[in-house]
Design a protein with these regions (language model features):
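Positively charged
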Residues: 8-173
Length: 173
């Protein structure tokens, strides 16, 4: 064998370049539920999701959530970074309000495009956390919208498919 001196090996960082872009067929697929056996993989997946989100925030100035399929991980998992990190495994939405609100939505898979969509004002999110413990979270407003956006990704639905009408698109500088 031989020894290489003064060599620094950098672990590769996940960046915006790793995020699947609009048109990638994987973004339109239904994701599979995680099994308990896959729980040990979640830590690395979340690290990758966090790094991608941080890069988007740095370059584009937005990003509160990212879904596993956006990195080609076809599992029912998303990651939110709000007041603290939230790891959301096998989520289910219940009790969506009949009250809706309209907003301009953005997405890491097409960071320069805004899409006008209607979302439920409130909902309840049931999910498993990183310890495989059941959680229930009643949310409204901006957090409700964010959860609906990320949940859609797990079902192969993009906000472009929920546009309010055919004029509900605009470019973001």
């Amino acid at each position: 064998g031989y020894k290489i001196e003064n060599t620094i090996i950098f672990e590769s960082m996940i960046t915006v370049d790793n995020i699947l872009k609009l048109g990638d067929p994987r973004l339109y697929e239904n994701c599979a539920p995680l099994t308990r056996d896959e729980l040990p993989l979640v830590e690395n997946w979340v690290k990758d999701l966090h790094e991608a989100m941080q890069d988007i925030r740095k370059r584009y100035g937005f990003g509160r959530g990212i879904a596993a399929p956006q990195l080609g991980i076809m599992k029912r998992l998303f990651y939110l970074h709000l007041d603290r990190p939230y790891i959301i495994i096998n989520p289910e939405i219940t009790d969506p309000s009949t009250d809706m609100f309209e907003l301009w939505d953005d997405c890491m898979s097409f960071p320069n495009l805004l899409v006008k969509v209607k979302r439920h004002q409130s909902l309840t999110l049931g999910y498993l956390d990183e310890n495989w413990e059941k959680q229930s979270w009643k949310v409204e407003g901006a957090i409700s919208e964010l959860i609906q956006h990320e949940y859609d990704h797990l079902n192969g639905v993009l906000c472009t498919m929920r546009a309010s009408d055919d004029k509900s698109f605009k470019w973001k500088e």
